[in-house]
Amino acid sequence: PPYKKLTKEKELLSVYKAEAYNTDTNNIFSFFIEKSMRIGKVVSLIVPKSLINAPEFNKTRQLMSKKRVSHIIDFGEKGFKKVKIETINFVVETQRKSAQTIVESYITEKVVVQQQSYLMDTKFPYWIIYRNEDFDKVADKMEFNVFKAYRDRVITKSLTKGKGQVRVLKSRNIGDNQIIDIPEYDSYVDNLDGLDVSKFLNKTNCVLLPNLTYNPRACFLPKGCIADGSVAILTLANNDEVITKEDLSFYATDKFTKFYAIARNLGTRSLNIDNNSVFFFGKLKG
């Protein structure tokens, strides 16, 4: 199906949404999946890999999980030549209940058979198609769903400068429980007017995590600083929760890094930390 968000065609979008279960997305391919499942016994489509994990497709995954998803092929970026988009293929048997799912990966060059219920376990916010024993060992030691995620969408280079009143932290400034100073990279602003991110200024219980990386590391937000969109700002989902530097240092370990790669389904493009993926930045139990 076409991969396109309908933004200007309001009337057409309302027609599509009138029949859709998932009205949280404007992307046509989601409507194609639903209609195909209504009229077909066996449905197989190549769609963006974001179907697996993005919050806007939560309801689409719910629908699919109730049927038998017999195959998932992860093409990574190899689906279409010269097109830098990650894609997957799935086969859904709409008149059969879940059983086993065959996962074929162009990334790992392996074929693995797992119980569908294991890969689509509802205790996680989305499907984990590379889930394995190593992933489970780390997951069993962690308490999840500790944070909410925020990302600035306003601050650009044109708004920042080399010196100023308030420091604007960017992804490379974030180290393991430390802020890294980088000459000619560090940024500042003088005026926070109109910047929504200013609400976090001097709130020291906020946690900073770089976006778009398989090299996770975290630190607390220092006073006198904010962060641009290359950094996720995490706040506690429950204010009674206590997060320590030891909790944050776990994110920089090899064990968590490998766990996190599986949690992100070995994706390469859509690695922004959203309110689904932030789930996995938990804290160690006890």
Predicted regions and their residues:
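Signature of N6-adenine DNA methyltransferases within the class I
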Residues: 1-145
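Polybasic, glycine- and aromatic-enriched phosphate-binding surface used to engage nucleic acids
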Residues: 133-286
